[in-house]
């Protein structure tokens, strides 16, 4: 987990920057450590699997972070990042397509990036919902739970921009509302 809270400042859709958040007394804010960890997990590129089709046909760059190569063996870690970058040149397609729906792949990649938080019992459950919005946009909402309480609630907007040919992501780095706890159930 990060020790400090990060805040994204957006000049959307051209670029974005992430900065540290200071408390009123001048110390670094560490109150949103789990939300910051989720932002890092979803905002960095995970290593593509050997069977993944890369967005650039002539490229051999499978992305990822070199520290992930033996993360589990060396420091009991897990691969950091998300494979959403693989969708950079993808069209938003439906379930009838051979590779499956783009919205479904967005949800799968997000779940894969967040699953270590569940496996290591940092959170007890997650909800991931991606929805196509218009012709060029898929929005995703990510919620992490501890028991019935929502501890992280983030909205992600993933845009396919044919003009610049890359995936642009906007993160709401703070919880986007206080939702009522879920009813008790199996976790």
Language-model-detected regions and their locations in the chain:
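Immediate N-terminus of the mature polypeptide
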Residues: 1-112, 124-187
């Amino acid at each position: 987990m990060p020790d400090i809270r990060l805040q994204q400042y957006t000049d959307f859709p051209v670029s974005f920057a992430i900065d540290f958040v200071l408390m009123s007394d001048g110390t670094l804010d560490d109150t949103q450590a789990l939300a910051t960890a989720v932002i890092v997990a979803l905002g960095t590129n995970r290593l593509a699997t050997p069977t993944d089709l890369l967005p650039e046909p002539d490229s051999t760059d499978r992305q990822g972070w070199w520290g992930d190569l033996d993360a589990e063996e060396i420091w009991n870690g897990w691969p950091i990042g998300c494979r959403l970058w693989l969708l950079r040149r993808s069209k938003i397609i439906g379930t009838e397509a051979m590779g499956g729906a783009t919205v479904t792949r967005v949800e799968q990649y997000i779940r894969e990036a967040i699953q270590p938080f569940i496996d290591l019992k940092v959170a007890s459950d997650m909800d991931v919902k991606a929805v196509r919005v218009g012709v060029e946009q898929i929005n995703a909402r990510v919620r992490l739970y501890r028991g019935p309480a929502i501890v992280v609630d983030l909205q992600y907007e993933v845009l396919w921009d044919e003009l610049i040919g890359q995936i642009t992501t906007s993160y709401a780095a703070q919880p986007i509302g206080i939702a009522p706890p879920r009813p008790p159930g199996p976790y």
